[in-house]
């Protein structure tokens, strides 16, 4: 009987592995070649137009993608609006700080795609978000890369499903590695994807603990560069409006580059979960490598983004193509 149980367990693990890989295998770069051949250019044009209106488009879209993929996979479930009978993912406390410009980027790109008669209701919101994310990275000076397409939009979205699925600013390396592993991502993927913090901003309240109440021994986190502490305290005094935000990268906040890793070498990681990548000996060599070689970082980032885009993919009857990205059909 024990042998049977072990066998059944192995078969279950194997079936789950095959199911995940089967979904990923159905993704391909030319998925819309026969239905909406110009979809990537249509989306890129919409993204460019949105960026011209506000730079926030770039970090907001990138962050939206991560938050979508880490909760039940890359299925645009984070786009769904809550109703009287359902509190959706976007209204979980961990998602309330997602900037509206990220959502608006997808909505505007969807409108542009659907304005082309043969493309209308043929392209999923999940794929539009994937393409838009690639585009904001590239338009911020980051690498251009081919995306895999063919995702369907998710059929459910609940705030309760978000709990415990997203990394916290206070996470240590073990917690980060464990959370990424749940999504089939390696420690190297985690370090590469953390490099997205080269763009964007965070609310002051997210770093108060490092500046004013770190632990019983030190009010200030001793791993923070002293000059950076002075800078952060000037930008984030204790009585500041909690809505005030600061740049994740104090040096090149509007440029996708490897300066994030150089900042870590200097003790200028904004979150504990950033700085730990340098202070922990297991991840430090990778930080040093990418700080010294931006091309290697770009290559690693592309590889990890493609892997991220395969997480929890819905294909076929497991999803659909939403007419409105913010509501189920």
From Swiss-Prot:
Lineage: superkingdom: Eukaryota
Site (Transition state stabilizer): 63
Residues reported in the UniProt entry to bind Ca(2+) 2: 198, 249, 252, 257
Disulfide bonds: 36-119, 69-74, 125-325, 204-236
GO CC terms in record: extracellular region
Binding-site list for substrate: 167
UniProt-annotated catalytic positions: 67 (proton acceptor)
Catalysed reactions, as listed in the record: 2 a phenolic donor + H2O2 = 2 a phenolic radical donor + 2 H2O
GO biological process: hydrogen peroxide catabolic process; response to oxidative stress
E.C. number: 1.11.1.7
Carbohydrate attachment residues: 215
Class in the EC hierarchy, top level: oxidoreductase
Cellular compartments annotated: Secreted
Name of the protein described by the UniProt record: Peroxidase 51
Organism: Arabidopsis thaliana (Mouse-ear cress)
Lineage, uppermost ranks: Eukaryota, Viridiplantae, Streptophyta, Embryophyta, Tracheophyta
Gene that this sequence comes from: PER51
């Amino acid at each position: 009987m024990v042998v049977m149980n072990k066998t059944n367990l192995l078969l279950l693990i194997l079936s789950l592995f095959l199911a995940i890989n089967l979904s990923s295998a159905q993704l391909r770069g030319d998925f819309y070649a026969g239905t909406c051949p110009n979809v990537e250019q249509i989306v890129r044009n919409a993204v460019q137009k949105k960026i011209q209106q506000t730079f926030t488009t770039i970090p907001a879209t990138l962050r939206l993608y991560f938050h979508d993929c880490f909760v039940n996979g890359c299925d645009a479930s984070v786009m769904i609006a809550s109703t009287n009978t359902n509190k959706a993912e976007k209204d979980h406390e961990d998602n309330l700080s997602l900037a509206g410009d990220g959502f608006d980027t997808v909505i505007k790109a969807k409108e542009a795609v659907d304005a082309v008669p043969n493309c209308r209701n043929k392209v999923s919101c999940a794929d539009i978000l994937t393409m838009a994310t690639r585009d904001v990275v590239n338009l911020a000076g980051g690498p251009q890369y081919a995306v895999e397409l063919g995702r369907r939009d998710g059929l459910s979205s609940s705030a309760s499903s978000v709990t415990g699925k997203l990394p916290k600013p206070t996470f240590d390396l073990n917690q980060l590695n464990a959370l990424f592993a749940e999504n089939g991502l390696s420690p190297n993927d985690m370090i590469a994807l953390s490099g997205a913090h080269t763009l964007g901003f965070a609310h002051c309240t997210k770093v108060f603990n490092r500046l004013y109440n770190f632990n019983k021994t030190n009010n200030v986190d001793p791993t923070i560069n002293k000059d950076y502490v002075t800078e952060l305290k000037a930008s984030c005094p204790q009585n500041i409006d909690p809505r005030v935000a600061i740049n994740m990268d104090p040096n090149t906040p509007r440029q996708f580059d490897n300066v994030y890793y150089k900042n870590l070498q200097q003790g200028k990681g904004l979150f504990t979960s950033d700085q730990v990548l340098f202070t922990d000996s297991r991840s430090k060599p990778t930080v040093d490598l990418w700080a010294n070689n931006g091309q290697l970082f770009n290559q690693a980032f592309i590889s990890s983004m493609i892997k991220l885009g395969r997480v929890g993919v819905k294909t076929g009857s497991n999803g659909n193509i939403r007419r409105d990205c913010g509501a189920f059909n």
